[in-house]
C-alpha cells in the first residue's frame, strides 16, 4: 500500500482478512460534516452515524475550509488553524492521542496526508469529531469528509 491512494485490490484484501472468507460487497461511500462559523479560539463537536447495515473502512480524510464563504482558487486556499480529534464510539478509541493540526492529518487539495493504513469502523457506531480553532481572529467554515467503502458481509 505504497501509492497515493489504496488500490481496489488492496482494500478488498484488507477487508477479506477481517471477514474470514465470507462473500463481501464493498461500496464506495463517504460521510461529510460541515462546521459553520467556527470562531477564533472556539471548538465545535459533531457526530457521524455509521450505517447500521454495513461496516465502514475509512481510507482517507479530506477537508475544505473558507473564511466568510470567500471564493478560492488553487493559490488562495485557506489553511485553517484548527485541530481535530476523532473518537470511534464502537471501539472507544481516539484516532490520535490528542487533537492534531487539521492540515497535518487531513488532505486539503494538493496537500496530501494519507492515512498510513485503512481503519475499520463498525456499523451502528458513531464518530465524534471535535474541531478546535486556534485562529487569532478569523471565523472558519470547514467541511470534513471521510472517504472509504461500506462493507457488507454475507453468509457463505
What are these language model-derived features?
Residues 1-156:
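Beta-strand-centric surfaces of beta-sandwich/beta-rich domains
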Amino acid at each position: 500500500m505504497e501509492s497515493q491512494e489504496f488500490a481496489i485490490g488492496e482494500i478488498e484484501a484488507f477487508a477479506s482478512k477481517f471477514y474470514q472468507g465470507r462473500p463481501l460487497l464493498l461500496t464506495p461511500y463517504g460521510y461529510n460534516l460541515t462546521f459553520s462559523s467556527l470562531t477564533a479560539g472556539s471548538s465545535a463537536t459533531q457526530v457521524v452515524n455509521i450505517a447500521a447495515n454495513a461496516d465502514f473502512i475509512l481510507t482517507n480524510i479530506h477537508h475544505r475550509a473558507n473564511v466568510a464563504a470567500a471564493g478560492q482558487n488553487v493559490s488562495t486556499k485557506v489553511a485553517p488553524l484548527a485541530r481535530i480529534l476523532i473518537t470511534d464510539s464502537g471501539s472507544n478509541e481516539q484516532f490520535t492521542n490528542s487533537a492534531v493540526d487539521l492540515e497535518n492529518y487531513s488532505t486539503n487539495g494538493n496537500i496530501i496526508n494519507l492515512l498510513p493504513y485503512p481503519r475499520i469502523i463498525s456499523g451502528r457506531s458513531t464518530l465524534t469529531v471535535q474541531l478546535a480553532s486556534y485562529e487569532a481572529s478569523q471565523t472558519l467554515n470547514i467541511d470534513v469528509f471521510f472517504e472509504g467503502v461500506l462493507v457488507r458481509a454475507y453468509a457463505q
